[in-house]
Amino acid sequence: LDFLPRSSVKECVTEIRTLLNEARNVDNTQKNVYWLSDKAVAYLQVELELYAGNYPAVLELTKDLETEYPESVLGADVYKYLWSSENSDARIFGKYQLEQIYMDIRFDTFEKGDYLVLSQNVDYEEEDIRKEWSEIPFVMPDAKNVRLLGKYNKMNRDKVASKYVNVARAAGMWLMRVEALARSGKEGDAVALANRMLK
């Protein structure tokens, strides 16, 4: 298909926007998180409008999603269920898995390893749920102690069953709202919201 002319970014965004608008249907309820519900399509619209720099639309769409995914779903009690076989109120859309998402991750060799090393500047408090679910103490081949980051990696290493791959979750929607606020000249509101999310 090399002979076909390439569409511009604007044309692509316009076409995707049209398709997402057509896909919206309030009757498409979220009976199961691995169904593409109306709210999951709304999440995709937020991503598209943020990419397009249409910040008023991002704020409007996230305001609509806020009724289903209020700030309260950002808490540790809800968060921990995102990486389990339990339902989570913070999961907007998740790919259903019958097997582990990763079948062969190597932590024992540098050449075949899957490394995402946390900066020493990042330090979770002991009671922070992100530490429990995301942080992996590790010794590098040069005997240096580091901390790896990766929820699915840790679940695989610890042989914890993974039922969902989280494609869209409430925290993503709220972070897109933070960015839209900041880029709309509402830096104070953006900082206040980000700080509430970090509590």
Language-model-derived ranges and their functions:
Residues 1-173, 183-189:
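Structured, solvent-exposed acidic/aromatic patches
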